[in-house]
């Protein structure tokens, strides 16, 4: 369980956790694979979300998934780029979260194994990404400002020691 005082400080930064959908490169599931290849090459991301026509996250795609299709024969072929759709290649088994309903602790646990998590609303519509990087930035904020917000007293400190410490700090 995350300490309530730490959770409070993290929640102060939680608005900056979410990178909004308007700033995220994505492809649609019915796009030609060629389109995904171009997007991934241009934006230099390793993985991007795949959305359906209703802007729900239905998958993830990487450049490696596309190049695997190009290498299925004995030589490199660009034919699959024109013949296949993104939905034919995308990863369908992935984690996504509803930012409002997912606890900070659950977010942190999911980010251990995922560099980012697609964030959806209650209807499954893509809202943006929660990234490990943004979470680490929030944690950095907590580590560097905790003492500005809270007086931390070791549990093994006696009452006279505590009183002396408080008096000395004034």
Where do the language-model regions lie?
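Tandem CBS (Cystathionine beta-synthase) repeat/Bateman regulatory domains
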Residues: 1-170
